[in-house]
UniProtKB/Swiss-Prot annotation:
The gene is clpP1. Its EC number is 3.4.21.92. NCBIfam families: clpP, PRK00277.1, PRK12553.1. This is ATP-dependent Clp protease proteolytic subunit 1. CDD domains: S14_ClpP_2. SUPFAM superfamilies: ClpP/crotonase. Keywords: Cytoplasm, Hydrolase, Protease, Serine protease. Its main location: cytoplasm. GO terms for biological process: bacterial-type flagellum-dependent swarming motility; cellular response to antibiotic; protein quality control for misfolded or incompletely synthesized proteins; single-species biofilm formation; single-species biofilm formation on inanimate substrate. Disulfide bonds: none annotated. Cleaves peptides in various proteins in a process that requires ATP hydrolysis. Has a chymotrypsin-like activity. Plays a major role in the degradation of misfolded proteins. Fourteen ClpP subunits assemble into 2 heptameric rings which stack back to back to give a disk-like structure with a central cavity, resembling the structure of eukaryotic proteasomes. It comes from Pseudomonas aeruginosa (strain ATCC 15692 / DSM 22644 / CIP 104116 / JCM 14847 / LMG 12228 / 1C / PRS 101 / PAO1).
Amino acid sequence: MSRNSFIPHVPDIQAAGGLVPMVVEQSARGERAYDIYSRLLKERIIFLVGQVEDYMANLVVAQLLFLEAENPEKDIHLYINSPGGSVTAGMSIYDTMQFIKPNVSTTCIGQACSMGALLLAGGAAGKRYCLPHSRMMIHQPLGGFQGQASDIEIHAKEILFIKERLNQILAHHTGQPLDVIARDTDRDRFMSGDEAVKYGLIDKVMTQRDLAV
């Protein structure tokens, strides 16, 4: 796919409400207008903002796959500001990040909590960042189910399986022992940027652009 290929429109943030700035580019072929997020996508920048849910996850996955097709060797930059959300939606993003050829650099802007923190930690080693006043939080998955006792038991086993799997992923990316992860995710564990670096959740707190890759 060529560098001049169609750049897909990014409607998720626009749909969240408010006006999205437009950028007009001029060339010998005339003018072309982009919403700001589609223009940033041309620079291989993806925004993951708000609750992690199926629609948003599908858009992020589509953008990751598109940028891989554009250039499988060049890094992708994923900016995260999310309180977390659906485990299955988040895992679709995580698995795609690990699946594609380009390195995915992750940066927390604001907050990366719950599934947002796992996606932040799942970035390419050495390329996981946050801004100075960002907050990160890890915890165990939340679940609630009503129904027959046998169905409740089935769902309880599934939640415990998901909890163990998420802990294994965090242990892999942070370098922390699995028992430490299990202890720390038993309740909400908030971290500053410096604390997240020490924990292994990220690699560096960015204060200026030239500190990033």
